[in-house]
Amino acid sequence: MKMTNRKDIEQVLWNACDSFRGKIDSSRYKDYILSMLFVKYLSDVSKERREEYTKQYDGDMRRVERAMSRERFAMDEQSTFDYLYANRNDAEIGQKINVALNHIEEHNSGKLRNVFRAIDFNSQVDFGEPKEKNATLRNLLEDFNGLDLRPSQLGSADIIGDAYEYMIAMFASDAGKKGGEFFTPSQVSELVASLVQSKENDRIYDPTCGSGGLLLKAYKKVPSGKVAIYGQELNAQTWALCTMNMFLHGVDDARIWQGDTLSNPQNVEDDNLMKFQVVVANPPFSLDKWDSGFLSEAEADSKGKKKMSAELDQYHRFDWGVPPTSKGDYAFVLHMLSSLDAENGRMAVVLPHGVLFRGASEGKIRRQLVEMNLLDAVIGLPANLFYGTGIPACILVFKKNRTCRDVLFIDASGDGNFEKGKNQNILRDSDITRIVNSYQARQNEDKYSYVASFDEIKENDFNLNIPRYVDTFEEEELVDIDEVQRNIATIEAELAEVQAQMKGYLKELGL
């Protein structure tokens, strides 16, 4: 029997997309397709395990059921893909799918509670009238029916999870700017994970985890898998994608919370923020009104306007300064630092370049981060790496308990440090390796990296703009004016000769 490979899964997913194209926007139908893939995977795994136990216990169903109750997840018959496929022509198939999803949640409430709450396979808004809806859902079930996702038929344990992430990436690309809200390009995630280097027994946290790709990259740096994964995501649909993504990669014990990380952080133990050895994030760039969740407790000024203050945050994250309402970059940075382990905390965050040089409250915060010896490196990335925005970004690396006071600056934005793509630029493996090696070596490299002392940064008034430290200026070749004039004279002589010839030809023609 032919093994199922990643291309097989991707082809089925693309066929499923065809069932929706022209009817629903991809930002919506991605949730239906990825949810159905999840159901098919759970069903096939459950079916194979049941078959194995039935054979092992000679058909003793009591022992089979006892063994099944100890599996990763539970499914009843009416929740399985096979049941749904058998009822694909039912006039109420949309409702049957909804009921199946509800049962899966109920039977696995510890791991999958609310994961399908934003999905409605009976939606008239998305699917139209019953006849159209039933035809679309029938096609969707038929698309997935030929896909065998039993573990014994998958070439490796990572195939299903990798295919799921591939489709998330494709949907993110199609969604443009919106795609950047739930997916970080794989190469950027790989770079961030390589910079923080997760170790066994680390607790890893992403406060704006999107669909979970960055967390998974950090997780995979530890072959034994002996790490604890935590994340929080504001968008309910994206939170569901992340929860399923973790499950498909075998990270069943990941704790992924849903809610506003800034105004309602869930990483709380005994009324204090939890601490993590590794914190990574690609938060929304320059988030406007980031403080809106705090303002209900704020007092209005004489003009009736409410303003954020450090006292409104019970976790004291903004004691070093309150970022401007219109730019939430440092709000996320301060939250991450407040969640970082004091002994061995490592942190890498993707941010717009404005955080390096903007003034006012951001300048004061930046100064304190350097003075407190928390900033370890500033890495400039090429432009156009991210979905929906061409602006260049940087990675700030922070460490607790640093023994030196210098800061490494790397400018990896220039030509030769990336591959130019049709719609997006791409970091190649060699580009990532060069950045990581340079970060670990902490040495000066002409037009690429520079180790700046604290005094140098202080002299620059704590402005961290990379060109102040890494000189990438290419001197233009000196122009030999005499040679240029000689070339002009030669060209003019040749032109005069050609013009004379042309006049002769015209005269011969009587023109």
Residue positions per predicted region:
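Conserved S-adenosyl-L-methionine
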Residues: 178-281, 285-297, 301-302, 351-354, ...
